[in-house]
Amino acid sequence: MSDNLKIGLQYLTPKHALTRLAGKLASAKMGWLTTAVIKWFIKQYNVNMDEAKNPDPEAYSTFNNFFVRELEDGARPINEDGSVISHPADACVSQFGPIMDGKLVQAKGHVYSAQELLGGDETLAAEFMGGEFATLYLSPSDYHRVHMPCDATLRKMIYVPGDLFSVNPLTAENVPNLFARNERVVCIFDTEFGPMAQILVGATIVGSIETTWAETVTPPTGPAVKTWHYPLSGDDMICFKKGEEMGRFKLGSTVINLFAPNSIKFDDSMENGIPTRMGTPFAHIVK
């Protein structure tokens, strides 16, 4: 099948309906059939079950339970240096670099707007103008829980409705504004080095996006942007330590981080296309 045909089918496919169906099937308890699908998936995508807290495929009552499986203790050591920002997920680096003229690189020759990514919030987008961004793609074989790259306090969460194009190199190179048009959950944190955004982007077959404080954010999908504000003082603050879980994908997609200007420097190990492991050095705080 040609690339043009694959992209054309992306536009024609009823992606939301397909994703709702996939979500229902993935959360259904179907006994031996669930186990058979899990075993096929492990073999097909070479999933390393040795690092799972429960490596037995038959222990998972639904496919979703398997997909968001916990890792055994110590499987992802967190870099303890306070000046180091750690990778939030097991993934592959898609793109990273400066936010120039309010634009992020989607793929070679393709850019999109930070303001659109953040749900159209011009004031919020201004906090990241001239800063840095990184886009991390989670493949089917990856661990699909997302963790905090640094100590932080949650300020705001924004649900941005949108499409559900598949996310992969082909769509990144051929679907304009891919990450700013797909459904997403934008999480804004305050840190010792300034504001940070951690954005969970949906895709076809991504049954749900969850956070540890709000649980399932989507589905259901909605027609309008929704915003939640959180206290920045008092007993009700939502604070995280580096390495703590903050969200997960039930079938999953992409994490995008935004950093304020002059706040971080990416680690020398960062390159487009390299695999990442949660907890390893991602960037360094600029003192």
Swiss-Prot record:
Site residues by UniProt (Cleavage (non-hydrolytic)): G252, S253
Q: Can you quote the record's cofactor note?
A: Binds 1 pyruvoyl group covalently per subunit.
Known post-translational modifications?
Is synthesized initially as an inactive proenzyme. Formation of the active enzyme involves a self-maturation process in which the active site pyruvoyl group is generated from an internal serine residue via an autocatalytic post-translational modification. Two non-identical subunits are generated from the proenzyme in this reaction, and the pyruvate is formed at the N-terminus of the alpha chain, which is derived from the carboxyl end of the proenzyme.
Indicate where this protein resides in the cell.
Cell membrane
- Pathway, per UniProt? Phospholipid metabolism; phosphatidylethanolamine biosynthesis; phosphatidylethanolamine from CDP-diacylglycerol: step 2/2
Q: Which reactions appear under catalytic activity for this entry?
A: a 1,2-diacyl-sn-glycero-3-phospho-L-serine + H(+) = a 1,2-diacyl-sn-glycero-3-phosphoethanolamine + CO2
One Gene Ontology CC term in the entry: plasma membrane
Keyword Membrane among record annotations = yes
Q: What is its EC number?
A: 4.1.1.65
* UniProtKB keywords: Cell membrane, Decarboxylase, Lipid biosynthesis, Lipid metabolism, Lyase, Membrane, Phospholipid biosynthesis, Phospholipid metabolism, Pyruvate, Zymogen
- GO molecular function ontology, one term from the record: phosphatidylserine decarboxylase activity
List, alphabetically, the InterPro entries matched. PS_Dcarbxylase (IPR003817), PSD-B (IPR033177), PSD_type1_pro (IPR033178)
Cofactor(s) in the UniProt record: pyruvate
- Annotated function: Catalyzes the formation of phosphatidylethanolamine (PtdEtn) from phosphatidylserine (PtdSer).
Task: Give the HAMAP family listed for this entry.
Answer: PS_decarb_PSD_B_type1
Q: Subunit structure of this entry?
A: Heterodimer of a large membrane-associated beta subunit and a small pyruvoyl-containing alpha subunit.
Family, according to the entry, reads as follows: Belongs to the phosphatidylserine decarboxylase family. PSD-B subfamily. Prokaryotic type I sub-subfamily.
The name this protein goes by in its record: Phosphatidylserine decarboxylase proenzyme
Organism equals Aliivibrio fischeri (strain MJ11)
Upper classification of the organism: Bacteria, Pseudomonadati, Pseudomonadota, Gammaproteobacteria, Vibrionales
